[in-house]
UniProtKB/Swiss-Prot annotation:
Its main location: nucleus. This is Zinc finger protein 69 homolog. Residues 49-69, 131-155 are annotated as: Disordered. One of its GO terms (biological process) is regulation of lipid metabolic process. PROSITE patterns: KRAB, SCAN_BOX, ZINC_FINGER_C2H2_1, ZINC_FINGER_C2H2_2. Residues 131-152 have a biased composition (Basic and acidic residues). It comes from Bos taurus (Bovine). InterPro entries: KRAB, KRAB_dom_sf, SCAN_dom, Znf_C2H2_sf, Znf_C2H2_type. One of its GO terms (cellular component) is nucleus. Residues 74-146 form the KRAB domain. The lineage of its organism: Eukaryota, Metazoa, Chordata, Craniata, Vertebrata. GO terms for molecular function: DNA-binding transcription factor activity, RNA polymerase II-specific; RNA polymerase II transcription regulatory region sequence-specific DNA binding; zinc ion binding. The keyword NAD does not apply.
Length: 524
């Protein structure tokens, strides 16, 4: 069925459909509708398909040979780009090699589509011999005997046919980009395609220009660059359409070439271990250090090593105290931009991370992850000394200080040290007199939240801690633990002088008074 559809088309339109690679009639039918709408009016779709099939393709593709309808068929000139000696000298070596490769491939594609041997242009001969393919100022691009006069006098149907020529050129170039996935080839094609449109505007005027731009937009939506290039030309053309004057247009074209990542999203560098792809080779190099474990960036202050230079820069702010990211709302400063972004949510009240089990919302993703462990019971962080497990790594770090005796938090008022930052915060309220937790019932204030919770039981009369041995109940957890020592016989408080042990800390304190009195009496 697909072959029958192709037979009913003229050779040029059939070639256009084949470039879209339909695998069956079902996929080919929409293309048939497109090409019918595109060329309805008699420009290309002959009323008699057999007559179109019988024409000699070789004669049609010979430059300078007019057709019966004054329609110009696709020649190598239409898909080639010429440079003067000055322009050629401004091209970088990589761009020259790319130009040589694309031009040779375009000529090969044209010969393949035509199905016959075309006369070889001089520029192709120069490229094959390795010569520089620039032309003199007196020469015009392409064949000097081209049908320029007939182009300027073309009708609306000729304009539609020129659209097909551009579509065919676009399709042949598209095959190269989908196969190679090279960003510079894409940019080169966009630049050449845009130059062709500017020439077309000069030949046919603004009304035909609008027709071509409308058709080109539909063409861009039809073609897909694959997973790595997503609608890049549509973005570029929308940007270029806003440039009305030649000066603005040249600036826009320069922006496209100089800043390709603003317009085209391409991932061309792939990790051969995990197959993750990156836009730039430096990002791939940094990623490979995850697999190799290499950490070439070392802090001179503490000797800590990092795999990325940016990580070292961020770490050094710990030593310098630099906090370059400041909140405009409250003036609080942060070392990391991500910390500032998280802090902003305290002002906006935004909590985008929601637990799907209890619908509790959190402002940070890490808070949600930690919360989920309360549902799963997971405690992934284990102490190597005693085997105790924790849900959060900071809780493990604080616990390890019990074994090491480390107390890194010191009070600036009395130099007392603490193993936890929270303990230091509570202690500093002794010096400042701050009591932020206030009872709503009686107005009494407390330094710690736990003290307020214990106090509330006085008003409620609740004694939540009940001994399962004797049934005695207590309001406070600390009182309940002391009572249990009556049953267990535990005496955790031991005198350093005589080794006597006690169940309560207060009993040990009173016992110490005995030793102090004895020492005082002996000195007398």
């Amino acid at each position: 069925m697909l072959q029958q559809l192709l037979i009913t088309l003229p050779t040029e339109a059939s070639t256009w459909v084949k470039l879209h690679h339909p695998e069956n009639a079902k996929e080919g039918a929409p293309l048939w509708e497109d090409v019918t709408k595109m060329f309805e009016g008699g420009a290309l779709l002959s009323q008699d398909a057999d007559e179109t099939q019988g024409e000699s393709l070789k004669d049609e593709l010979t430059p300078g040979t007019p057709t019966t309808d004054s329609q110009e068929l696709l020649t190598f000139k239409d898909i080639s780009v010429d440079f003067t000696q000055e322009e050629w000298g401004q091209l970088a070596p990589a761009h020259r090699n790319l130009y040589r490769e694309v031009m040779l491939e375009n000529y090969g594609n044209l010969v393949s589509v035509a199905g016959c041997q075309l006369s070889k242009p001089s520029v192709i001969s120069q490229l094959e011999k390795g010569e520089e393919p620039w032309m003199t100022e007196k020469e015009g691009p392409g064949d000097p005997n081209s049908d320029l006069k007939s182009k300027t006098e073309t009708s609306a149907s000729n304009a539609k046919y020129n659209i097909l020529q551009e579509q065919l050129y676009h399709g042949m170039m598209m095959e190269r980009f989908m196969r190679d996935d090279v960003i510079y080839s894409t940019l080169k094609k966009v630049s050449e395609y845009d130059d062709e449109l500017e020439k077309h505007q000069d030949r046919h005027g603004r009304n035909v220009r609008q027709t071509i731009m409308t058709h080109k937009k539909r063409s861009q939506e039809t073609y897909k660059f694959g997973k790595n290039i997503v609608s890049s030309n549509v973005v570029i053309e929308q940007r270029l359409r806003k440039c009305d004057t030649p000066r603005k247009r040249n600036k826009c074209k320069s922006d496209v070439i100089n800043h390709p990542t603003s317009y085209i999203r391409v991932k061309t560098y792939e990790c051969n271990i995990c197959e993750k792809a990156f836009k730039q080779p430096i990002h791939l190099t940094e990623h490979m250090r995850i697999h190799t474990g290499e950490k070439p960036f070392r802090c001179k202050e503490c000797g800590r090593a990092f795999s990325q230079s940016a990580s070292l820069t961020t770490h050094q702010r710990i030593h310098t105290g630099e906090k370059p990211f400041e909140c405009e709302e409250c003036g609080k400063a942060f070392r990391h931009r991500s910390s500032l972004n998280q802090h902003h949510r305290t002002h906006t009240g935004e909590k985008p991370y929601i637990c799907d089990k209890c619908q509790k919302a959190f402002s940070q993703n890490i808070s949600l992850i930690q919360h989920l462990r309360t549902h799963s019971g997971e405690k992934p962080f284990t102490c190597n000394e005693c085997g105790k497990t924790f849900r959060q790594i900071r809780h493990l770090s604080e616990h390890i200080r019990i074994h090491t005796g480390e107390k890194p938090y010191a009070c600036t008022a009395c130099c007392k040290t603490f193993s936890h930052r929270a303990y230091l915060t509570h202690h500093q309220r002794i010096h400042t007199g701050e009591r932020p937790y206030k009872c709503k019932e009686c107005g009494k204030a407390f330094r710690q939240r736990i003290h307020l919770s214990n106090h509330k039981t006085v008003h409620t009369g609740v004694k939540a801690y009940e001994c399962n041995r004797c049934g005695k109940a207590y309001r406070h957890d600390s009182s309940f633990k002391k009572h249990q020592r009556h049953h267990t016989g535990e005496k955790p408080y031991e005198c350093n002088e005589c080794g006597k042990a006690f169940s309560y800390n207060s009993s040990l304190t009173r016992h110490h008074e005995i030793h102090r009195r004895n020492v005082f009496q002996n000195n007398i």
